[in-house]
Amino acid sequence: MDIFRLLTRGASVKKDPKNKNIGDAVENAKASNIEKNDKIAAENQITKELDFFHNKRIINKVNYNKAKETHAEDKEDKDNDNEEDEIKEEESLQYQKPLITNDEEAKLLRKSNKSNVSGEDIPLPIGSFEDLITRFSFDKRLLNNLILNHFTEPTPIQCEAIPLALNNRDMLACAPTGSGKTLAFLIPLIQQVINDKDTQGLKGLIISPTKELANQIFLECIKLSNRIFLDKKRPLQVALLSKSLSAKLRNKVISDKKYDIIVSTPLRLIDVVKNEALDLSQVKHLIFDEADKLFDKTFVEQSDDILSSCSHSSLRKSMFSATIPSNVEEIAKSIMMDPVRVIIGHKEAANTSIEQKLVFCGNEEGKLIAIKQLVQEGEFKPPVIIFLESITRAKALYHEMMYDSLNVDVIHAERTQVQRNKIIERFKSGDLWCLITTDVLARGVDFKGVNLVINYDVPRTAQAYVHRIGRTGRGGRSGKAVTFYTKEDSIAIKPIINVMKQSGSEISEWMEKVSKMTKKEKELVKKGRAHSERKQISTVPKIDKIKRKRKLEMIQASKKRKAIETKETE
């Protein structure tokens, strides 16, 4: 679709006596449309999305051509003339100078965006996507895809990360959840693949800790690379390294040079590389999304193997996350060449659009009562995500909530990928109101419009807390996060209170009086041992539990006696 057609969709023009034909066509339209068009024309205003290039004169001219085409569809020759006029307008378009042209303007923008950027020889940020056209010869097809998907202004992280990547700089980037980090690395990656169109084979590699996040990144990449051809016959190819694709690569059904960009989880990628089914030596752009997770003790060896396999001399490395612990910063310094550090807001803070709340429940039974109170008081507004610390507890809460006639389902690592995908689709479409899960869905997955996140169990670290509550308050929307805690969580909630303070959340008087964490407490939190083992989730009274246990023991004893008697008879 022509970018100017998109920009002028639904626009109208003033009636001009000189343009009698158009005036007559407008007069013949419905009265409601005439009134609407006259009002828009009289106000002579162009919306922010339509005035993408900040050039009303050109857009008004395109509006004129669009109106002429709309009201003379039956005349083919006029249609052709209009298209030619639009092409001429595009060719004659003179882009304005970039909005950020010097260090002083960059300083003001960074102050406004709360951006903290450190490193050597830092390029200027962008103030709009128009800057990309003037500074980097940005591909118009990619720009068109951005507009089609309603991305009209760069977010703070995109303002910094995109020019850094296009200048081939290594970077460590930290920005709040829902702030547009995925686009911050996808936009420059696609542009760099286009720039390197003469080279065939894998150029960009994106690593994600979970299958759900990898799939989400893949879908976003597909949207942005839609209808982009590197030559007349070869489209820009993006792949998600799934189980089936891995098998095809191993069996040589598909050439490892077919794809330009691959998105994968670490273990699956390493398996394919070790089987010599995929060559990473020509990868020029390596991106770690959720870097704090990919470089913790669970994934660090796998991430190191991937780094070793990407041996290109001009490899560009990027790390993105909502939280950056000090150990990840040290790793970044050791593996990157002259890196730039980008922090939007505070590196341990949550999204400021999320209302955060701590609720004392006394004990495990109190948590179930607290959920029922949220429902009764009207605060349980779907869609809702509830996080628990283990699969066993997630299953138990699911069975409890089923009896309350709530539209609920559960996702955890024991469910198959097909089951997980179906549940996620149901949740995204609104068929499912409440989703119970473990930390498997705490990172990166973008659920539009989640109103409430409940931490049924206190997260083990501040980083886990930030990522969990980051499932709400995304893309400029507001959200709410409620964390239940008991007396056993007295140490575990201290990092949560710190995050709330750094995020500017409303703090109760008792929170101000909470003592700072001791060295021993910090060590316990770091190891995930800040609270004792939790009791089983159940609404069944204690006396009934004892009766059930005795009954079960009696049944088992009876079965055992029968087995012995049968054996003696034989």
Curated annotation (Swiss-Prot):
InterPro entries xrefs: DDX52/Rok1_DEADc, DEAD/DEAH_box_helicase_dom, DEAD_box_RNA_helicase, Helicase_ATP-bd, Helicase_C-like, P-loop_NTPase, RNA-helicase_DEAD-box_CS
Motif (Q motif): 131-159
Motif segment (DEAD box): 289-292
Region named Disordered: 69-96
UniProt-annotated binding residues for ATP: 175-182
Location of the Helicase ATP-binding domain: 162-342
Comp. bias regions, Acidic residues: 79-89
Pfam family, any one: Helicase_C
Coiled-coil ranges (or none): none
Keywords recorded for this protein, A-Z: ATP-binding, Helicase, Hydrolase, Nucleotide-binding, Nucleus, Ribosome biogenesis, RNA-binding, rRNA processing
GO annotation terms (biological process): endonucleolytic cleavage in 5'-ETS of tricistronic rRNA transcript (SSU-rRNA, 5.8S rRNA, LSU-rRNA); endonucleolytic cleavage in ITS1 to separate SSU-rRNA from 5.8S rRNA and LSU-rRNA from tricistronic rRNA transcript (SSU-rRNA, 5.8S rRNA, LSU-rRNA); endonucleolytic cleavage to generate mature 5'-end of SSU-rRNA from (SSU-rRNA, 5.8S rRNA, LSU-rRNA); snoRNA localization
Keyword Repeat appears in the UniProt entry: no
One GO molecular-function entry: ATP hydrolysis activity
Enzyme Commission numbers on file: 3.6.4.13
Cystine bridges: none
Bias (Basic and acidic residues): 69-78
Record remark: domains: The Q motif is unique to and characteristic of the DEAD box family of RNA helicases and controls ATP binding and hydrolysis.
Family: Belongs to the DEAD box helicase family. DDX52/ROK1 subfamily.
Subunit (UniProt): Interacts with the U3 snoRNA and is associated with the 90S and 40S pre-ribosomes.
Job of this protein: ATP-dependent RNA helicase involved in 40S ribosomal subunit biogenesis. Required for the processing and cleavage of 35S pre-rRNA at sites A0, A1, and A2, leading to mature 18S rRNA.
Protein name: ATP-dependent RNA helicase ROK1
